[in-house]
Structure formats: structure tokens, C-alpha cells
Amino acid sequence: MPSEHPFSDGISTLNPKETMNDTAQITASYGRRYIVRTPDGTTYEASTRKKRVDFACGDRVRISPVNAEQVVIEDFLPRQSLLYRQDAWKTKLIAANVTQLLIVTAAVPSPSVRLLQRALLAAEAAGIRAVIVLNKADLPETALWREKLKFYETLGYPVIETRALENAGSLRPALQGHSNILLGQSGMGKSTLTNALLGSQTARTGDISAALDSGKHTTTHARLYDLNGETQLIDSPGLQEFGLHHLQAADLPRYFPDFRHLVGQCRFHNCTHRAEPGCAFKAAAETRAASPERLAFLQGITDELPG
């Protein structure tokens, strides 16, 4: 294989017709460029037909050989889940077939409650278990943010504290047996946590990662790693916004653990949970049985959604 090939390290040079299964999993995605891995562990650079971009890291796909180093992705196999975001202009696929979303947050730099709440909604809508990771927990600035996160624990979302290099291992029991994805703002330490969890595997995947990242130290694309035979981990690029235009307004209350038990209890079936008489949501907020701020958040998201 020519040494200048950007994916030369770790990519098979064997005859694909002799070694390739017709299925694979996407282990890295970068625009329209992908890395896929077949069941026997062989990796290939992959492209798509007709410039398709509806594939995500974690997808299990059907492939066809192009040459000894490259394959074409023909289609994806049925998905267990799909995590994505959508605003008024575009849809961005994040990961497929994940069973657990770990939202990595920290007191420094300034954490976004908006992003946290939106990511939790997206996980609920996709049927994905959500966990909050409080990273950099040893920083003195953490105390106030830790207190704010206690509210989400009351909603049933576990909060796990980490200090990246020192005790990333505290995450391992929560990761075990899941297809996991780390998601959060830039600077929260997702990639540092990933490297600490991977250990020596980082060196084995480093060359391909460097080729995809063009030498940058920040994650610019999603990458999937095997922690063991039962556990996978996807590191994803940092986010600042999480559009939810793919959700339906009528379904939103079911994605709120603090409001879903009130669904169907309003006097009017088409209640907007604002000024209508007999609104169970408004009554709960007025009596502090539910958070008024959370009701305002529900109303705000409803206003954003088309139709």
C-alpha cells in the first residue's frame, strides 16, 4: 500500500473478495468519509453511493468491495436506535445503535443547562438510557454545579463524578454491556475520559484518528471503540446547540419524567399547558409539585417545533 495513503495504518491490504464479510460496522465518520470494520476485525476506508449522508457512527451496514483498501456502503441494517439533532435548516446524525448516552459536563468552562436538558429530551425520544457525568469534580467551582445536578437525579438520571485521568475507571461499571456515547460541550473532557478508559488501545487507533482529525487535538468526528466484547464507546465532537425539530409537540410531555404521569389528566385533550382551565401541568407547577422552570422549558420547546 502506498505510504501516502491517509488511512494506511490499520487498513487491510488483503484481497477483499477473500476476506470480506458483506456486513460491517461504521467505527468513524467524517463528512462523507467513513471507516468500517468487518466481523473479523478488518477495517476499510468507505464511501457511499450517490453522496448519501444518512449513515452514522455505530451503524451496521452492508458493504461491497472497491479494491483491496476501500469499500462502498450500500445501506444500513435495521437500527436499534438513532440519536440525532435537527434545527430549521439541517439534520445531523450523531450515532446509531447506542443504548446509553453519557452527557459529560463540568463546572469549567461554563456548563449549559440548555444543552443538558435538550440532550436528555433527545435520549428519551430515542429510547436511550441517559447518564450525567460530572467531570473535573475536584475543581472548587464544582460545588454549585453539583448542587444543580441533584435535581436531575430526582428525575431518575444517574450522576457519576469523575476526574478524568485520576478516576475515569469509576465510569466502567456504568458502561458495561452498553453501546455508549459521550456527548457534551467542547472542553468538558470527553476525549480525555475516552483516552483514560481506552489505555493502550489509544495508540492502536491513533493513526487512523490522526488522519481523520487532520492533526487536530480536538475531536472533529465521531469514533467508536471496543472496551471489551460487550461494551462499546463512541467519542463525539463537542456541541453548543441541540436542535429538537425532529420531535412532535404532542409527544413532548412523555419525554419529561416529571410530567409524563400527568399526560391525559388535563380537562382538554389538546391542552397547551398554558392558560387553559383544568390544566394538570399548570396546577402541578403552581403547587410546586413540579418545577415551574421545567414547565416553562416544555412550553418553550413546544413553541420551537414546526406545525
UniProtKB/Swiss-Prot annotation:
Subcellular location: Cytoplasm
Gene Ontology biological-process entries: ribosomal small subunit biogenesis
Residues annotated as binding Zn(2+): 266, 271, 273, 279
Protein name: Small ribosomal subunit biogenesis GTPase RsgA
GO molecular function: GTP binding; GTPase activity; metal ion binding; rRNA binding
Annotated GTP binding sites: 135-138, 184-192
Signal peptide: none
UniProt entry tagged with the keyword Plastid: no
Domain CP-type G: 85-242
Keywords associated with the record: Cytoplasm, GTP-binding, Hydrolase, Metal-binding, Nucleotide-binding, Ribosome biogenesis, RNA-binding, rRNA-binding, Zinc
Originating species: Neisseria meningitidis serogroup C (strain 053442)
Record EC number: 3.6.1.-
Cofactor note: Binds 1 zinc ion per subunit.
UniProt cofactor(s): Zn(2+)
